[in-house]
């Protein structure tokens, strides 16, 4: 496959050239390449090529194939789906049914990342991560309270998460990372206090990174005043001041990765109190991130690529995440000028007008998604 006249970033440098894909890899990047042996040619003039996103925090309550197609539409090529044998990233859930999993066997079967949903069996899980050189993702089970503690929770009479206790379990993992020198990714980080603790432990030698939900950078808790079930997200959204602080942290590279936090709504309840928690957002991941983070100048386009592709690939030790020769050909082709509107009524972003749309997804050199009438062959 030959991508003609592609615009892309090589590190921080904006380039325009042709990109040849062969045998799952990006094999050649040069100007004025000619097709060979009936090679498929895709015209990318006026479009942008970037690495496909990697999402490390997805909950799949729907069929995996359906979830995967939604992800492709949102520019996400690789998914880490909790409790799913088909997950594109082979994960090891360290605890199942309150018992320690057979981590050694699961690692030998191809497990790529170890996930801890609680601090139970902390010592054993930590030693497995170190012994098998497994990246460790801490994705603590949610408390499933609708709001964070504060004035709005009292005003609306909703159950709330008590902020005073949210970091008590995370600190144990932070100290383990420092003491054992284990790379640890803390999932669903949405508190400035947590980020300050991460920085403090990293200053002491820990190897911690933070992953924050995209929704918490775009929305704040004021949306709860409408009692719409689509905003019932776990963990809950923060107040505006906290949200602005998260944006500053992202801008200052204190947040390493972003996640759609996608979880399908397993309920059609009309009342906020009776509805299920969830965040149906992955099919609009690229457009939401581009619109609210890049166009609104929270971060640069290059930094968006880092927090949604490059850093994840490095954490997983994958040969992917950048548009470079000899990297895996996991790419998306996008139209940055296209305008769309979120149509999924279960999405927290429903009705929002977005900029930037995925035209084609390519995984290991093969097209996995193409928008109708997009990326015409030349």
UniProtKB/Swiss-Prot annotation:
<comment type="similarity">
    <text>Belongs to the metallo-dependent hydrolases superfamily. DHOase family. PyrC' subfamily.</text>
</comment>
<dbReference type="GO" id="GO:0006145">
    <property type="term" value="P:purine nucleobase catabolic process"/>
</dbReference>
<dbReference type="Pfam" id="PF01979">
    <property type="entry name" value="Amidohydro_1"/>
</dbReference>
<dbReference type="GO" id="GO:0004038">
    <property type="term" value="F:allantoinase activity"/>
</dbReference>
<dbReference type="InterPro" id="IPR011059">
    <property type="entry name" value="Metal-dep_hydrolase_composite"/>
</dbReference>
<protein>
    <recommendedName>
        <fullName>Probable dihydroorotase-like protein</fullName>
    </recommendedName>
</protein>
<dbReference type="InterPro" id="IPR032466">
    <property type="entry name" value="Metal_Hydrolase"/>
</dbReference>
<dbReference type="GO" id="GO:0006221">
    <property type="term" value="P:pyrimidine nucleotide biosynthetic process"/>
</dbReference>
<keyword id="KW-0665">Pyrimidine biosynthesis</keyword>
<dbReference type="GO" id="GO:0005737">
    <property type="term" value="C:cytoplasm"/>
</dbReference>
<dbReference type="InterPro" id="IPR050138">
    <property type="entry name" value="DHOase/Allantoinase_Hydrolase"/>
</dbReference>
<comment type="function">
    <text>Non-functional DHOase.</text>
</comment>
<dbReference type="InterPro" id="IPR006680">
    <property type="entry name" value="Amidohydro-rel"/>
</dbReference>
